[in-house]
Amino acid sequence: MILKAIRKVIDGADLTRGEARGVMQAIMRGESTPAQVACYLVALRMKGETVEEITGSAEAMREAATMVITDVDGLVDTAGTGGDGASTINISTAAALVAGGAGVMVAKHGNRCVSSKCVIADVLEALGVTLLDDPKRQAEILESVGFMFLFAPFHHKAMKHATEPRKELGLRTVFNVLGPLSNPAGARRQVVGVYDEALVETMARVLGELGAEQALVFHGAGGLDEISTIGPTKIAEWTGSSVDVYQVQPADFGIEPATLNDLAGGDSIHNAAAIRSIFAGEVGPQADVCLLYTSDAADERSSVDLGGR
């Protein structure tokens, strides 16, 4: 199947949702060679991935995942694509923890280093959190605490068949956007930052196709895969039936514009210390962006409109 798909994509034709799903299923089962996987990923990247192709690929990822079964209603995920190269503090991680502490049920899906010098797994370990690979225990913690981190390699073991081709390519591919679309706890309310403005509306439509109840997808000034307090943020909101696209500014929320340097991160120890400072009540640009992101996560849970639109 993958060879047929490669030929079709090289000729500039789009795959159907079913075709993309079938190719990804074959990759997840280890039925494609590393060379075939690499060729497919590059061909798809050069053509440009469509909503149908991303949706089908995400469906295959979900099917192959080790799921966390829980009765918790209204789960929210704040996973983003990473890969913006900005090396900020872990904004979505801090926001997820604040939202969880405020009563939002957060199933945060994530991995290790992508856009920051450390990502959620690294900073949570620096904060003393143990990464769990027991879905039953994860469900228990989520239900009792209101927050659980779902470490992607524990839940998407079939991804091992694409690891080496991706590593050797060193390019962004469709896999870079599949993480936020493949939450192992089935979160249907999402706040998703993307590394490319061109992906904002596309990802919102994909989330709608995948059954999301509500979603905010955004790309911020400074090239951030985050809500930005540096300048304008482009947002695509999946309302449950349609996609609304708009832009917000820091001033809309009464926030003073920040600089990229204000939000700069470091290694896991540095970022963990920054998060502790925010939690201790320190005010400033890092706290501002954390609270703004948190309000978006809370809005996804409570169906409150994004303030200042």
Regions found by a protein language model. Name each.
Residues 41, 89-145:
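A glycine-rich phosphate/pyrophosphate-binding beta-strand-loop-alpha-helix module
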Residues 36, 91-95, 119-120, 199, ...:
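Catalytic-loop motifs flanking and including active-site residues across diverse enzymes
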